[in-house]
Design a protein with these regions (language model features):
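Conserved donor-nucleotide/metal-binding helix-loop-beta segment in metal-dependent transferases, i.e.
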Residues: 131-158
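Short phosphate-binding loop-to-helix
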Residues: 86-120, 177
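Short acidic/His/Gly/Ser-rich catalytic and metal-binding motifs that mark active-site loops
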Residues: 34-40, 84-86, 161-162
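Acidic donor-binding segment of Leloir-type glycosyltransferases
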Residues: 71-94
Length: 229
């Protein structure tokens, strides 16, 4: 079973200043309260296993974003003290979420990114078992010196949710997470006159249902909860 303990600061986590030259891209990772996390997996995982899985996913996502060569800074927006400690230990900047709701929290983090000089933001949920620094850099590679706003979306495997969202400039469109957010973000991009790029790849799989968990087993590997067959 994945240990929920918070790791020490890894020695090989690159400093954000080592990101490649170019537009300043800030990754934003929202992490909700750990209480009741992944409740939709309650049929196959007990509360402790869901907590372990959530911490494992948060740790993996934050570390991948910090290691991505095209990401200048990683912000983790969360109401949870444990997650803020985890984020800081991994080299990200934790932000306390004061408003309830995913879009409200992301809006606050976006303001922080803009205040820090971000040219673009990349929003990454933590429930992506195939996340890696390479997958993040592949999305970031869509960011050049656009003559007009740019929106790049990785929809979920059903084509409904948004598993990754790059926006340049950071406030080019509103945030529409929840429900059929992929369609909503595409519509927002069209309304803003933004260039739209829809990507596939490993980040199309997210962990919402028991079926998703089975599909993710090869990626979770030895870190998966012990009772998941």
């Amino acid at each position: 079973m994945i240990s929920p303990s918070i790791p020490a600061m890894p020695h090989d986590v690159p400093d954000a200043t080592t990101a490649q030259a170019g537009p300043r891209l800030v990754a934003i990772i929202p992490v909700g309260a750990l209480d009741g996390a992944k409740s939709r997996l309650g049929a196959v995982l007990d509360a402790e296993e869901r907590l372990d899985l959530t911490l494992h996913l948060a740790r993996t996502t934050i570390a991948a974003a910090v290691a991505a060569g095209r990401v200048a800074e990683v912000l983790v927006i969360t109401p949870d003290d444990t997650v803020r400690v985890l984020a800081a230990n991994l080299g990200a900047r934790p932000i306390r979420q004061r408003d309830s709701g995913l879009n409200q929290g992301l809006a606050a983090a976006r303001e922080e990114a803009i205040a820090g000089g971000a040219d673009a933001i990349l929003i990454l949920p933590i429930d992506l078992p195939d996340v890696s620094s390479d997958a993040i850099d592949e999305i970031a590679a869509t960011l050049g010196e656009p003559q007009r706003p740019l929106v790049a979306i990785v929809p979920d495997r059903h084509g409904r949710g948004t598993n990754a969202l790059l926006i340049a400039p950071p406030d080019a469109i509103g945030l529409c997470f929840g429900g059929s957010s992929s369609t909503a973000h595409e519509a927002a991009a069209a309304a803003a006159g933004a260039r739209l790029i829809v990507l596939g790849g490993p980040l199309a799989l997210d962990l919402d249902t028991p079926e998703d968990l089975l599909l993710a087993e090869p990626s979770l590997g030895r870190g998966r909860p012990a009772d998941v067959a």
